[in-house]
From Swiss-Prot:
Summary of the knockout phenotype: Reduced proportion of the cellular volume devoted to chloroplasts leading to an abnormal chloroplasts distributions. Lower levels of chlorophyll, especially in plants lacking REC1, REC2, REC3 and FMT/CLU.
Ranges of the TPR repeats in the UniProt entry: 848-881, 890-923, 932-965, 974-1007
Subcellular location(s) of the protein: Nucleus; Cytoplasm, Cytosol
Region (Disordered): 1-22, 278-303, 1194-1226, 1238-1292, 1369-1400, 1466-1499, 1531-1552
Role according to the record: May act as the scaffold of a protein complex, which sequesters key factors that are required for the G2 to M transition in meristematic tissues. Together with REC2, REC3 and FMT/CLU, contributes to the establishment of the cellular volume devoted to the chloroplast compartment.
Protein name, entry field: Protein REDUCED CHLOROPLAST COVERAGE 3
Stretches with biased composition (Polar residues): 1242-1265, 1373-1385, 1535-1546
UniProt GO MF annotations: mRNA binding
SUPFAM superfamilies: TPR-like
Primary localization class, coarse: nucleus
Keyword tags: Cytoplasm, Nucleus, Repeat, TPR repeat
Amino acid sequence: MAPRSSKGKSNNKGKGGDKKKRDDKLLAPSLVEITVTTPYETQVILKGVSTDKIIDVRRLLASHVETCHFTNYSLSHKVKGHKLNDNIQVLSLKPCFLRMIPEEYLEESQALTQVRRVIDIVACTTRFFSKSPNKSIVAGNANPTPAPDGLDMVAIHTTPKLSQFYEFFSIHHLSPPILHLKKVDGEEAGEKRDGDYFGLKVKICNGKVIHVIASVKGFFAVGKQLSHCHSIVDLLQNVSNAFAKAYESLMKAFTDRNKFGNLPFGLRSNTWLVPSPVSESASPLPTEDEHWGGNGGGQGRNGEYDHRPWAAEFSVLATLPCKTEEERVIRDKKAFLLHSQFIDTSVQRAVRAICNVMDTNQQTSGTTDLPAGSILLEDHVGDLSIVVKRDIASLDSKPEATFQNDAFVLSSEELAERNLLKGITADESVIVHDTPALGKVIVRQCGYTAVVNVKGQTQKAMSDFRDILIDDLPDGGANALNLNSLRVEFHRPHSVGTSVENQPTQLDWDDLESYRCIIQELVKINLTKLEETRVSSVRPIRWELGSTWVQHLQKKETDVCGKPATNDETELSVKGLGKQFKDLKSKSKKSENISAVNEKDTRLHELNEEDDLGQKSIDGLFTELKELLSEEAFSRLKETGTGLHLKSKEELTNMAYGYYDEIALPRLVADFGSLELSPVDGRTLTDFMHIRGLQMRSLGHVAKLAEKLPHIQSLCIHEMITRAFKHLLRAVIASVNNMAELPVAVAASLNFMLGRRELEGCDRIPGEEYCLRLQWLQKFLSRKFGWIQKDEFHHLKKFSILRGLCQKVGLELVSRDFDFDSPNPFMSSDIIGLVPVCKHVLCISSDGRTLLESSKLALDKGKLDDAVSYGTKALVKMIAVCGPYHRNTACAYSLLAVVLYHTGDFNQATIYQQKALDINERELGLDHPDTMKSYGDLSVFYYRLQHFELALKYVNRALFLLHFTCGLSHPNTAATYINVAMMEKEVGNDHLALRYLHEALKSNKRLLGADHIQTAASYHAIAVALSFMEAHSLSVQHEQTTLQILTAKLGADDLRTQDAAAWLEYFESRAIEQQEAGRNGIPKPDASIASKGHLSVSDLLDYISSDPDTKGNVAHRKHRRARILQVNDKVASADDDAHRVASQIDIVTWNNVAEADVTKSRSEVNDPDTVVDKTNIETGDIVVHRLNVDRQTVEESTLDEGWQEAYSKGRSGNGAGRKSRQRQPDLMKKRMLLNKHHNRNQDVQQQNIYSPLQKTSKGPSLSKSSPRRALKNAEIDVSTNTTKPQLKASGAAAVTSTTLASKSLSYKEVALAPPGTVLKPMLEKLELNLERTETQIYRTSSASSGEESKSDTVMLDLPIEGTELHCEKQESQESAESVENLTSESEGDLGSYRGKKTSDISRTKLSASAEPYNPGGFLVIDLQSSAATIGSYPIMVADPISWAVVSCGIHSPPYYSAIHSNGVGTPRSMNPDAPEFVPRRSLQNSSQHAGEDASVSVDSSSCLKAEKDAVDLKKRELASFIVKSSQKEVPAALSKTSPEAESGGTSEKDSAVTEIVYSREEENGANANETNGGEGFVIVAKKRRRKNKVRLTNVAAGLYHQPSSVCA
C-alpha cells in the first residue's frame, strides 16, 4: 500500500487535497532544454529533466564531447548571477541559458584535476586493450562442459570471452593523442615563477615532447609565444596540429560510440576482473591515481574523522523526531551521512590495522606460534574499537556470532529471539534505532578479520549534543569508497603500505603442486570432521523474517475481514492467535449473542469460563513481553492487529519457524516461478532471500522446492558450491604465513576447485583429486545446506562460480581466458590482489524504498499516473537523503526511467537510465546486476528512439554479462534473446532474428514449462514472425497455444487473454483471406516446398519473396488488406495509410515500389519544413494523386542529438488506457480505413477514435469500435467499384482526429505507438493538418478483359515529401528470363502497364532487396504492440518476464514487454544525421538513372529526380531478386499451374514454414555469413535495411530487472 504523504495534512480537507494535487503535478517530470555558452563562444544544448540541478548540468557538460575536458569553471545566469550553487534547480532558471566562466586554479589540486581529466579522456585508447597475445593456455577451449539435455540455449552470438570484458570501453583502434605525460619538479621543471605549480612533459601522438607549466592562470608551453590557456587540451591544440587531429578523431569516436553520452572515462577498478594493461603497468586508472590527485573515493582517507564522537551522535540520532515524512527525511539524511562517514572511516582504519599486523608478522613470523582465532591487535581510536584476529585455517562453520555486540554476548537462542522481537516490532526507524548494529563493521582481508565497534560515553555526551551537524557528501554522493582501491597487491608494492615482495611472473610448478597437496590434506581433515559433527538444532532468525511475518498476518486478516459477514464474524477479531485462543471473544460480543439465541446458553457459559482463564493467561503474557519490549514497541505490536502481543517468546519462535517453512520458502519459490522475482546470480538471490528474512542455509530446501524451475535450482546449486569453495579458499589463505606465497596458494586452490583432473591413466578412471573434491562437496552441501548432490558438478557454469567466488573472497584476477578443461587453468600471475570484504547494515531512506515499491506496484497494475507520482517522489527522497549521484539513487533513476518509458516519454526514460548507468558503472561495478539491467533497459530505449545499431551494442553488452552470471539457461537471457531478435530484424537480419526467437521459445518451455505465461509470450512472438512470412495457418496454431495458456493461467476475463483472443481473430482472418486468394487464382508458394525437407530461413525468405500474384478481382479485394498488413509488418514504421486504400489492380506491386520511394525520399529530404504540392501521376487508365503533408504541422523539429520532444501529457489515462492493448488487431484494421494522408502522429492519436478502449468482445459489432466489420464493409464497396467507403473513412478521420486531439493519451495507447513516437495531443496542429490534407479518389476502368474487366484504381496518399508511386510489371506466367527484362524498364515505361491484366501484376514478399527503409514518416501498425508493459527485468528492464512483474526494477512482463513491441513505427522526430539511419546505396545508385525519361508530371523538378532515382533503383533490385529466386526456387511448371490447382498450397506452405522455423539453424547461420542475408537476396545497405518493419518483440522483453537495486 502506498504510504500517505504528510505534505497534504491540513484541518481543511479540501485545501489539503488541493495541495496534494498541486504537489503531484509539480512532481511530474518533464524534459528541459539547457543552453550553455562555452568559453569558445559556442552554444551547447543539453537535454535534461525537470528534477535536475546545477550539479546535474555539470555532469552533462562532462559527458559532452565539446566540454568534457573542462574541470575548473563556474556557471552564470543573467538573472541568478555568477557562480551558481550546485543545489539550484534548473527549473528556476528562466530563461534556461547558462554561461561557462573559466576560473583560476587557486590550488595546485585544481590543476592536478585538470591534468587527471585529460589523462582519463585519452586512457580509453590504451588502458582497456592489451596488445600482447592472450595468456590463455588453450584459449579456444575455454567453454565449460555443456549442460545435459541441452539445458542451455544455443549461443547464436559469439561466445563471450573474459579477455574481451573491457573491449566495450576501448577505442584502441585510434592513436592516443598523448603517448606519455610526466610531472616534473625542481630543476627539471625549469625556473619557477610566482603562481607556477608544477611542470609537465607531454609526449604527443607524433612523438614530439612539449614542456608545459601549470600555473594559477592556466597552462602555457615553455618557449612558445602563447598566452595562458585554461585547459591542457586547448594549449596542445594550439601548439600541435597533430594533437588537434588526433583529439578530434577521439571525440568523433566518442560520438560514434554513443552520441547521447556514457563516455568511456571516469571508470574505476571496481570489478573482480582487472584490465590487462592496468595489471601490467605500474599505475592504476587515472581516476584513482594518487600521483595525479586521484583516490579510491570515500571520506576520512587522512583520518580527519577518526576522533568524531560516534557514540554520542549515534545515540542522538535515535532520538531525533520521526513522526512525519518531513521529519523522517531530515532524520534519514543525517543518519545516512553519519553512517556513510562512519563506514568509510572504519573500513580504512580496519584495513590499515590489518596491514600493520601483516607487516609485523612478516618481520617476526609471529603467527606461527599463536593459536587460531587469537587476537593479534586491539586498538582504540576515539570511540572506535578495532580488534584484529587471525582467521581459522580450517573449514569449520564461519564465526558469524562475532557480528553481535561484545557488550552483551548472547547465545544462539537468545540472539534468535532478540532478532524476532526486533522484526515484529519494526517500523520505519528500525535501523536507526538499533545503535549497536548501526555502529559495527566487519572487514576480512588476507586471512585476517577486523571488527570495528563504537564504544564511548553516550549518556554524558548526549547532553552536549542536541543535533548532528554534518556536511553533504561531496560530488553529490559520487566517488564513494571503492573497496578495490584498498587492495593488497601481490606483484608490486601496494598502496596500503605492506612490504609484500614482488612475485615472479612465471609460474612455479613445484610450489603450485606443493600447495595442492596442502589443500588436499585440508579437505581430508574437514571431511572427517563433517562425518563426526552434528547439525545444530538451533536455527538462527533474521529480523526481516519478523517484519515479513507481520505483514503476512496483516494481509491475511484484511482478506478475511473483507469477506461478507457470517455467523462466525465475532471470531474474526482473534484470527491468527493460534488454537489456544481460537474461541476467545470479547464480553460485549458475548452479551449480544446471549440475547440472540437461547440454545447457545450452555456454550456461552463455557466460553465465559474460557474467557476468564484466557484473560489470566493474557495478563501473564502481557507482563512477559512488556518486560522484553519498550512501551512504544509493545504498543506498535499490539496495533498491528495480529495478536502476536499475546504470545510468549517460545510460541513466537515456534510460530515464526512454521511461517518460515510453510509459507515463506514456498512463497519465494512461487515468486521465482511467476518471474515476479528473477535472480541472475548469487548476489541477487542472496538479496531476495535476506530481504524476506530467509537464511542462505535454506538454499538446499529452495532447490528442492524449485524442482520444476531448472534455472532456479541451478542457481541455488551454484550458489551452494560457491559458498563451499569460499570456506575452502578462506581456510587456505589463512594457512599461509608468507604473503609472498599467497598468489601461488590462491592459484593452487582455484585449480583444485575448477581445474579438470577427472580421468587418469590409460583406463581413464577418475583421479584421486577428483573423487576427493566430489566427496567433500557432497558431504559439505549435505551438512551445510541439506542438499544431496548428484551429478551437478559435471555441468557447472565455472565462470559463474569463479565470479561469485572472487566477489565473496575479494579476489582480483587478470582479464584473460581461462581453460577450465585443463588441470591448471590458473597461474600465480593471474592473481592480482585481495580486496577487503565488508559486512555492515545498510542505512537508507525507508520511505524512499517504500515509494519505489509502490511505484512498481502501480506500474504492474497499469496505473501509470500513480507510478510516475510515486517514482518521482521516491527519486526526490533518495536525492534528498543520499545525493543525486550516490549508488542508492541509481535504482530510483532506473525505475522512474521504466515508468516513463511506459508512458511514452522515451527521451526522459533514456536520460534517467543513462544517469543510472553512469552511476552503476562507476559506483557498483561493471558487471553488477544493476549495471546489466541498465544496459538492457537503455538498449530498449535506444531502440524506441530508432537507434537500432546503438541498441544492439548495449543489448549485446547485457547479453555478454549475462553469459558470465546466469548463462544461457535463464528466463532473463531468453527475454534478452527476444529483444536481440527485435533489434536484429530492424537492421535486416531476419534469419538471425528468427533463430533468437526460436531459442527463446525452447528455453522458456524447458525452464518455465509449456504452460507458463512467458512461454505464451514466446509463442506469440513466433506467431507474429510467421505472419511476416505469410504462414498464417501456423500463426493461428501458435496463437491458439498462446490463448490456451493464458486462459488456463489468467482466465478469460484477463486483459492479456482478451488481447490474445483478438490476435487470434486477426491471424485467422489473414489465413482465411490467404485461402480465398488461392481459390480465386492467386498463386501461393509452390506446394513442393513441403517436400524439400528442412530449409534454412534464408531459403524460406527467398522462396516466399519469389511468389507471384495472379488474377481475380475478388481475390484482389480480399488480398489487398493482407498485403497492406504485410507491408506494415515489413516496414514497422508509422502508418503508411496510402498503401491501404489502394487500387485493387496495382496495389500489391505499388506498395512495394512506394515503400522504396518513400525510403529514399525520406532519407534524402532533411528539411522538415519542406512541403511538396500534390502531384498527379497518370499512367493510362490509372490516375494516382498523392498529397504530401507538411510534417512541421505535426512533428516537432528534430533535435541535434536525435532526441525528440516529449510531453508529459502522454502519460494520462491509466484507467481506460489499460484496455487499448486488448484490441490491437482491431486497431490495425480500423486504421486501414483512415484517409492515407495523415502522418503517423495523427494516426496514433486516431487510435482513440477507432478503438474506444473497451474489452474485446467475441463478436465484433458494427460500431466504429469494430474495425474488422468496418473494413469488410469498405472492401465490399471497393469490389463494386464504389469509392464511398474511402470517402467516409476520410471524413471520419477528419472529425475524430480533432476530437481525439483534445484527449489525453492512455497507457495502452502509448504501447501502440511506433518506436520513438512521442504522443502529445495537439488539437490545433491536427486541425490545421486536416485542413491541408485531401484525399482524391479517381475511378477508371481497366482496359483488361475477361474476369478482370472490372478493376478500380484508388489513389495513394503518401505523407512524405518528394515521393512518387510506380508500378512494377511482372508476369507470373512468364519465365524467369522474361522477368529479367524489368531491369531495362525506365520510369517512363509506366504507360506500358495500360491494358495489362491485374493478374500480370505480381507481388514481392519480404523482399530482401528492398532499399533500406528510412523510418521517417509512416506509421505502420505493429502486429505485436497491443500490450505495453515492461517486464521486470525486461528487458533487463528487469526481470524479463511477461505479465509477471519482476520485482525491483522495471516491471513489465515479457509478454507485453518482450513480445509486444510498443513501438511499431518510427519516432515522431529523429536526427537525420544519425549514422545508423544514413542509406549506404541510394545515392550511388541514383546517379545511374539520371537520364531516364519521366512519364509522371511533377510540380517540383527536385522532387521528380528523387522519385525517379528511387523507382529505378527499386526496379533493378526487384528484378534481380525475382530472377535469382525464380531460378532457384520456382519450378518451371508453376507458370502453367491453374489457379484451381494452386488453391490448396496454403497448408503445404505453412508446413514448410514449420520445417524452416524449427530446424537447421546451423545451416541458416552459415548461409547468413556467406551471403549476407541469405541466398538469392540482393545485398543492400545492411545497417539500414528494413528498419521500419514491425518489431518482433517489445522492448520490454529484453529488459532485465534486478530487484536487488530496489530492495537492497
